[in-house]
Amino acid sequence: MKYLILIILFSNAMWSQNLESHQWKDRILVVNADEKNRERAESQYLLLNKEQQKLIDRKIVLYKCIADTCMFYDWKNTPKMFKTDTTKQGFSIVLIGLDGGEKYKSNTVEKPDVFLNLIDTMPMRRQELRNRK
C-alpha cells in the first residue's frame, strides 16, 4: 500500500522501481503540475533549489513533474529528465518519508522550511542528528 502512491504518480515501471529504491535512503518530494500550473511548479523548485545544502543534509531528493515530463534532482549530480505517460491535474507537492509513507501533501507552493521543520521532528531524523554527536 505504501508504494501505491508512487505507482500512481509514476506509471512508468522503470521509474516506479527507481522510486522504490529510495526507501530507507532518501526522503522524496514530488511536485506534480499540469501545464496550466507550470509556474507554480517552477516557483516551488526555485524555492527548494536555494536550500540545496539543507536538502542534502536531510536526504531529500526531488521529482518535479510537469505534464508528461519529470526531472529528478538529488542536488549532487546533473538532473535527469524522463517522460511519464500519466497526466497531471492541478498542482500538488507530496513528501514521502524514508519508510515510503506519505508525510505531507499540499496543493499550494510551500516554503522549504515547511518540509525541513517537519522532517526535523521525525524520529529517524532525530536519530540521525544524535548519531552525529
PLM feature spans:
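Non-catalytic interaction/Regulatory regions outside core domains
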Residues: 2, 12-133
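Sec-dependent signal peptide recognition
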Residues: 1-7
